[in-house]
Amino acid sequence: MKLCDFEVGLDQPFFLIAGTCVVESEQMTIDTAGRLKEICEKLNVPFIYKSSYDKANRSSGKSFRGLGMDEGLRILSEVKRQLGLPVLTDVHSIDEIEQVASVVDVLQTPAFLCRQTDFIHACARSGKPVNIKKGQFLAPHDMKNVIDKARDAAREAGLSEDRFMACERGVSFGYNNLVSDMRSLAIMRETNAPVVFDATHSVQLPGGQGTSSGGQREFVPVLARAAVATGVAGLFMETHPNPAEAKSDGPNAVPLNRMGALLETLVTLDQAVKRNPFLENDFN
């Protein structure tokens, strides 16, 4: 599959979707994107910058949601203009899609909306690549139905069906907890869509701090290594210059000054894993 200006798939090096959870300010966004660009260019990792203009799904109604659509999209357009990077953001309702798609290179659907058929259809008809997140409540094999919905809508609109990615971000395991079943990454390959692993939301503790979500960022490297060892087309990781001061999802954000070391390890592992065919393909 061609994404932005690079090929993605199990026969390609993993690509990275990374950035702050939410757009907090223009300067921090440009600085963070610039640093990530430097790291990824050094390691030859294809890179898409992500950040949200609005966090519609918050634990508390008093939580920071963002700078608003117009300002958030303006700042993301500056990332494209100043740094020459492709950008991704999430959309939360059908009426947002057209405006967002006019700015960003890739759309993302929130995990909680993966079963909303009209919403998935509308995203697919935008003409943009779409990173479709698997709901925390969904079995991995059920993602085939979700991807098929997107492809059907694209085909009916006369658009390419080869624009959709399936993203794993953990599954609910009791109250305020998520776990990652690495088998799901192999199962989701049956969608014939590139599989992406969200290593930071997978360590989230939803609502774990009462009015906000907690997280265990120390396990991001553990799960990221496991996902790369399993074999994925891409990785999704949120980062922040100072996670303790992040306005959203700080507890599960990778410190920006540790991203280089983490990615260096993951690149080495990815190269080793993809050197040979995946044995599981021949076991049945």
Swiss-Prot record:
Its main location: cytoplasm. Pathway: Carbohydrate biosynthesis; 3-deoxy-D-manno-octulosonate biosynthesis; 3-deoxy-D-manno-octulosonate from D-ribulose 5-phosphate: step 2/3; Bacterial outer membrane biogenesis; lipopolysaccharide biosynthesis. GO terms for molecular function: 3-deoxy-8-phosphooctulonate synthase activity. GO terms for biological process: keto-3-deoxy-D-manno-octulosonic acid biosynthetic process. Keywords: Cytoplasm, Lipopolysaccharide biosynthesis, Transferase. Pfam families: DAHP_synth_1. It is found in: Cytoplasm. SUPFAM superfamilies: Aldolase. It comes from the Bacteria. It catalyses: D-arabinose 5-phosphate + phosphoenolpyruvate + H2O = 3-deoxy-alpha-D-manno-2-octulosonate-8-phosphate + phosphate. One of its GO terms (cellular component) is cytoplasm. Its EC number is 2.5.1.55. It is an enzyme of class 2 (transferase). Disulfide bonds: none annotated. Belongs to the KdsA family. This is 2-dehydro-3-deoxyphosphooctonate aldolase. The lineage of its organism: Bacteria, Pseudomonadati, Pseudomonadota, Betaproteobacteria, Burkholderiales.
